Regions:
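Local cysteine-cluster metal-coordination motifs and their immediate loop/turn environment
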Residues: 89-105
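Basic, amphipathic "hinge/linker" alpha-helix immediately C-terminal to the N-terminal HTH DNA-binding motif
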Residues: 445-452
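Flexible, acidic/Gly-rich N-terminal and inter-domain linker regions that tether
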Residues: 1-85, 481-486
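A short, conserved structural fragment
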Residues: 433-443
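C-terminal scaffold of the Radical SAM
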Residues: 2-8, 12, 84, 105-133, ...
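Basic amphipathic alpha-helical segments that dock to polyanions
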Residues: 413, 428-435
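Short amphipathic alpha-helical interaction segments
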Residues: 419-431
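Short, amphipathic alpha-helical interaction segments positioned at domain boundaries
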Residues: 452-488
Length: 488
């Protein structure tokens, strides 16, 4: 249940007064905070005020146009058809609506425009149609089931889609990630065994927080104890590659409560942990709360500093601006590929999914009803997109690559585009290097620890002048939010 602001204000004060950060951790966080020239960085655009959003694609969604429904199959010299594909499948059904979520989703109440059984049938039809146009001999390297809540599917639905995927050409070490919510697996070991027995080898659990009060504000349908039971079940099911998602800068959250969540999660020694700052979509319920209920801007920065310290204390490596792994081998391969220079082809299916085929970035319609009608009619359910030219493809390599521990490999970039990245983006790279955000070597251009901190702002540095101008006209910096949601 969503908490009214009047009640929340009282809860926040009472609970935060009773939670204190230990002195040593507070000193370490403050020491890290004091050494950064925040004002100097902000003067060059490196701050997190305004319409902050994690950058996961390029071009940004607010700059896209309508495209032909099959435009992603146009041949491209710079992005020729790959024999190694990544696949993303969107499952929009959820047990309820979180107060902050802006992804394509519907409540699984039996009244949606497309039933779950039909959705799986149509999803298979969409994948088949796309593979037929793209080239059915392409081998699948990675699969990610996202949502929504994929783990809301019934066992027979999981078996059906996984059986279909196994009929396709797959690489021997194909990575299959399945997103789960605690309320669907905390008391359902059989569902986890179904996932494992049908080829899923990586589980992503949406934990978000271990503070029950904060979870209530987020309108999550689980509590901390449910998360703990879920993690026990996931391990009992035999999964050896597990990631959890966490969110910070939430209303009602203090630095102390964030550190407590991070420490407990770290002690589980899961293979990887993803941490995201809250993205406050202006149309979501959580954005209607009074500003005083949120952590201060400075505390939001301290929370970001804190997750680096806590994860390092527990033996984790930072592998992306928002991801940590216990070993480098446990980095999610799909994320690494789609943020790289090569092997970036992403075939996506399902309502509200986005993909990149040949040189075209595309979004499927976010309306479940429209998606169903178009797939039934034999159409590709494309909504928005853009075919990228050479300049935008080079920029895409940086916009997405600046988040990763490998950065942008100079030889790989030069082999693809025929030029060293310094010759193209010398001014941008030079600025980031002078500000201490980039390390430039003979082999690669990589983010420093401070660069990781400003990964999204580094991405914006490589937006094209045309896109910057377009976003300026909209009063936006990142451009990652749609103007409105259409799910029905």
């Amino acid at each position: 249940m969503f908490v009214p602001a009047s009640e929340l204000r009282r809860q926040v004060k009472d609970d935060n007064d009773n939670m204190v950060l230990d002195a040593e951790t507070a000193e370490r966080i403050d020491a890290g905070y004091q050494v950064v020239d925040w004002a100097g960085l902000a003067s060059h655009g490196f701050d997190k005020h305004g319409d902050y959003c994690f950058i996961y694609s390029y071009p940004p969604v607010r700059t896209l146009d309508s495209i032909r429904h099959d435009q992603m199959f146009d041949p491209s010299e710079l992005e020729p058809r790959s024999d190694s594909l990544n696949v993303y499948l969107h499952i929009p059904y959820c047990s309820g609506i979180c107060s902050y979520c802006y992804f394509a989703k519907v409540v699984d109440n039996g009244n949606s425009a497309v039933s779950k059984d039909e959705y799986i049938d149509l999803l298979i039809r969409e994948i088949s149609a796309k593979l037929e146009r793209y080239g059915s001999d392409a081998r699948i390297a990675t699969v990610h089931f996202g949502g929504g809540t994929p783990s809301i599917l019934e066992p027979h639905q999981i078996k059906k889609i996984m059986a279909f995927l196994h009929t396709l050409g797959n690489e021997d070490d194909m990575e299959v990630t399945f997103e789960c919510a605690p309320e669907t697996v905390h008391a359902n070991l059989d569902k986890l065994l179904t996932l494992r027995d049908n080829g899923v080898n990586r589980v992503n659990l949406g934990v978000e927080s271990l503070d029950d009060r904060v979870l209530k504000i987020m309108a999550r349908r689980h509590g901390a104890d449910m998360t703990r039971r879920s993690l026990d079940n996931i391990r009992d099911a035999g999964f050896t590659n597990v990631n959890v998602d966490l969110i910070y800068a939430l209303p009602g959250q203090s630095v102390a409560s964030w550190v407590a969540t991070m420490r407990e999660i770290s002690r589980w020694q899961l293979e990887s942990v993803s941490v995201y700052r809250l993205r406050r979509h202006p149309m979501k319920r959580i954005s209607k709360l009074e500003q005083e209920l949120y952590p201060s801007y400075e505390d939001g920065l301290r929370m970001q500093l804190a997750h680096g310290l806590v994860m390092a204390d527990h033996g984790y490596l930072r592998v992306q601006s928002h991801k940590y792994a216990i070993k480098e081998q446990k980095i999610q391969q799909q994320t690494e590929r789609k943020r790289g220079v090569s092997r970036t082809q992403l075939l996506s299916a399902g309502c509200g999914s986005y993909g990149f085929l040949n040189s075209t970035f595309y979004w499927n319609t976010k309306s479940l009803g429209e998606w169903g009608r178009r797939v039934r009619a034999g159409e590709h359910p494309t909504w928005l997109g853009r075919t990228l030219g050479r300049d935008d493809l080079m920029r895409k390599s940086f916009v997405l690559g600046v988040h990763t521990h490998t950065g942008i490999p100079r030889d790989e970039f030069a082999q693809k585009f025929g030029v060293d990245p310094l010759a193209v983006f010398g001014d941008e790279i030079g600025l980031a290097q002078r500000l201490g955000l980039f390390e430039v070597t003979d082999s690669a251009i990589r983010p420093t620890e401070l660069g990781y901190f400003f990964g999204d702002e580094l991405s914006v540095l490589f937006y094209s002048p045309q896109i910057r101008q377009q976003l300026d006209g909209l009063g936006m910096k990142y451009g990652m939010f749609f103007e409105q949601d259409r799910y029905a």
